[in-house]
A protein has these predicted regions:
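Active-site neighborhood of thiol-dependent amide/isopeptide-bond enzymes
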Residues: 45, 49-110
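Secondary-structure boundary elements
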Residues: 1-72
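His-Asp-centered catalytic microenvironments across diverse enzyme cores
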Residues: 2-5, 9, 103-185
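Solvent-exposed, charged interface segments at domain starts and junctions
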Residues: 18-43, 79-100, 117-141
Length: 185
C-alpha cells in the first residue's frame, strides 16, 4: 500500500475521514484511537526477536496498520505513539515525541498552543490537553493527575506510578539505548 492508502485505511478503521487540522479533529482522532486500538504487549513479544537481530524493535507502519485493522492488535505506548505520530504527521499536524520518565513515550501536538496527547498510557485520556495546564481525570478504575509546577510536569496515576514528563521534543534515535534495554528480558 502507498502512503495515501495507509492513511485512508487507518482513518477508516478509526471511523473518520481526512479533515483540516484542528483541535476538534485531533480530539476526534484521539477518542477513536483510545476506543478502538488496544494497548497490549503481545506484539512487543512478537517484534522482540527481529529487534534483537536488527536493533529495530518496532513494526513497519504497514505492519502496524495491518495488525490494528485486521488482527485486533495495538501495542505498547511506544508502538501506539509511533503509529499515531505517523498518522498525525501525514494529516498535516505539527507533532513531536515526548519522553515521560520512566519509560513512556507520548506526543506533543502544536496547534494554537502545545497539547499533551497520550494514546499509549491506558489512562482515561480521550482528548488533547494543554501542555502547560494542570488537569485531573477519573473513571471507575483510577484518577489521573497532571500537575504543572515550576516548569515541571508530574503525572500521577492512583492507583499506579508517578512519572515526570519532559516537554522538549525528542527523536526516537536518541532513545535507542532505552528501547534496547526495555527489550532485554
Amino acid at each position: 500500500m502507498n502512503q495515501v492508502q495507509l492513511v485512508n485505511s487507518f482513518l477508516s478503521f478509526l471511523g473518520t475521514t481526512k479533515q483540516p487540522t484542528s483541535l476538534k479533529f485531533l480530539n476526534e482522532l484521539i477518542k477513536a484511537h483510545q476506543e478502538k486500538i488496544k494497548w497490549e504487549t503481545l506484539t512487543k513479544i512478537i517484534d522482540r526477536e527481529k529487534g534483537n537481530e536488527t536493533g529495530n524493535y518496532f513494526p513497519s507502519i504497514e505492519t502496524y496498520i495491518n495488525r490494528i485493522t485486521t488482527k485486533g492488535l495495538g501495542g505498547t505506548c511506544w508502538t501506539c505513539s509511533i503509529g499515531f505520530h505517523w498518522l498525525l504527521s501525514n494529516l498535516g499536524f505539527n507533532v513531536h515525541y515526548m519522553y515521560m520518565d520512566p519509560g513512556h513515550l507520548c506526543l506533543r501536538v502544536n496547534l494554537d498552543q502545545p497539547y499533551y496527547v497520550d494514546v499509549g498510557y491506558c489512562a482515561p485520556l480521550f482528548q488533547a490537553y494543554p501542555l502547560y495546564e494542570s488537569f485531573q481525570v477519573s473513571n471507575v478504575r483510577e484518577t489521573f493527575t497532571y500537575e504543572v509546577s515550576n516548569n515541571r510536569i508530574k503525572i500521577t496515576r492512583d492507583p499506579g506510578p508517578t512519572k515526570i514528563l519532559h516537554t522538549d521534543p525528542i527523536h526516537l534515535s536518541s532513545m535507542k539505548e532505552l528501547i534496547t534495554k526495555s527489550n532485554d528480558w
